């Protein structure tokens, strides 16, 4: 009879209900926390993109203080012509000789560089199977000066003229600036230890040998180093297209450090704030901004011109005009 609880099956025992008893709508609340954004395909272990990424050979990251190997006949010959300090010239046995290879061997012998002949398979292994044309040049790490030593040497030959590079990334620009510093009577170059081009074979080659005469120092903290130099009487002038001081109005006869910004972003905020003045180069209205190394060369040329013919104090010039 309906309502008779004594009838078999009239009362369902607890826990005997079919289906899930626990869930978002069950007896216990289920956490609904999200799992976060979906990772990129190459980071998912079983995705085909991840398998392709794992299959690709990984090139080790080269540190700035490691030995560098220059590959190819033209690059090696340019390094030897520029006087890049090298420790060994590797030539694969059986390599077909031409004028470039012959000149490389002759210049290495004249410079006292060890000439090592080895099997092509060994040269392939040494260069990680990169294209080498049967020849490679081993270049040791550059011996950087200390910023304090660089400043002391510059102050011994007053007025000091130094160039600091704020995160310049292209070693060719670094080499070109070193060359301009040598051409216009500068005393050295300062670069940050991180996020900056270093003195590699490319930079040395672009400097046309000036890197052998102009010291390059590396600063752990560029802003702090520039502050220390300013405390010792060196005026810090930044170079930027939006600078408030025209190059024509800069007195280049004082001890100076010219700060050149990176190719894309220019001067960083902290470095810009610690400059005594920010200088711009007057240009025609339709002209675009100059390359970093070209702009540095223009400023150094103007400073050298003023030092060859020191300008009169502004007060005397105004009185004479009156």
Swiss-Prot record:
UniProt-listed Enzyme Commission number(s): 2.1.1.-
Compositional bias annotation for Basic residues: 1-16, 43-61
InterPro entries reported for this sequence: Alpha/beta_knot_MTases, Ribosomal_eL30-like_sf, rRNA_MeTrfase_TrmH, SpoU_MeTrfase, SpoU_subst-bd, tRNA_m1G_MTases_N
SMART domains in the record: SpoU_sub_bind
Binding annotation for S-adenosyl-L-methionine: 261, 281, 290
Enzyme category, top tier: transferase
Chain spans, region Disordered: 1-69
The UniProt record lists the keyword Methyltransferase: yes
Highest rank taxon of the organism: Bacteria
Record-linked CDD domains: SpoU-like_RlmB
Cellular component GO terms held in the UniProt record: cytosol
GO terms for biological process, alphabetical: methylation; RNA processing
Record Gene3D superfamilies: 3.30.1330.30, 3.40.1280.10
GO molecular function annotation: RNA binding; RNA methyltransferase activity
Record-annotated disulphide pairs: none
UniProt record similarity statement: Belongs to the class IV-like SAM-binding methyltransferase superfamily. RNA methyltransferase TrmH family.
Miscellaneous: Was identified as a high-confidence drug target.
Alphabetical list of PANTHER family matching this protein: 23S RRNA (GUANOSINE-2'-O-)-METHYLTRANSFERASE RLMB
The name this protein goes by in its record: Uncharacterized tRNA/rRNA methyltransferase Rv3579c
Organism: Mycobacterium tuberculosis (strain ATCC 25618 / H37Rv)
């Amino acid at each position: 009879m309906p309502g008779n609880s004594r009838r078999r099956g009239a009362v369902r025992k607890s826990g005997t209900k079919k289906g899930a008893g626990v869930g978002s709508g069950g007896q216990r609340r289920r956490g609904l926390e999200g799992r976060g954004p979906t990772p990129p395909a190459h980071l998912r272990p079983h995705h085909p993109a991840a398998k392709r990424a794992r299959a690709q050979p990984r090139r080790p990251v080269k540190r700035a203080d490691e030995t560098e190997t220059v590959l190819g006949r033209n690059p090696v010959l340019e390094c030897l012509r520029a006087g890049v300090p090298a420790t060994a010239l590797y030539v694969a046995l059986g390599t077909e000789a031409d004028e470039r290879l012959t000149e490389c061997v002759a210049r290495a012998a004249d410079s006292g560089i060890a000439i090592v002949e080895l099997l092509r398979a060994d040269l392939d292994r040494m260069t990680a199977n990169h294209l080498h044309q049967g020849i490679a040049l081993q270049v040791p790490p550059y011996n950087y000066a200390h910023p304090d030593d660089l400043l002391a040497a510059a102050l011994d030959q007053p007025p000091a003229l130094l160039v600091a590079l704020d995160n310049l990334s292209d070693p060719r620009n670094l080499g070109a600036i070193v060359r301009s510093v040598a051409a216009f009577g500068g005393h050295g170059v300062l670069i940050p230890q991180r996020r900056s081009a270093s003195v590699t074979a490319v930079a040395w080659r672009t400097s046309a040998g000036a890197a052998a005469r102009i010291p390059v120092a590396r600063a752990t903290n560029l802003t702090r180093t520039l502050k220390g130099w300013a405390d010792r009487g060196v005026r810090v002038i930044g170079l930027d297209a939006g600078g408030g001081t025209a190059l024509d109005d800069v007195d280049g006869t004082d001890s100076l450090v010219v700060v050149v910004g990176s190719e894309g972003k220019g001067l960083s905020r902290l470095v810009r704030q610690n400059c005594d003045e920010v200088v711009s180069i007057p240009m025609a209205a339709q002209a675009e901004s100059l390359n970093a190394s070209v702009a540095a060369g223009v400023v150094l040329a103007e400073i050298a011109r003023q030092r060859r013919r020191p300008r009169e104090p502004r007060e005397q010039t105004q009185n004479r005009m009156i």
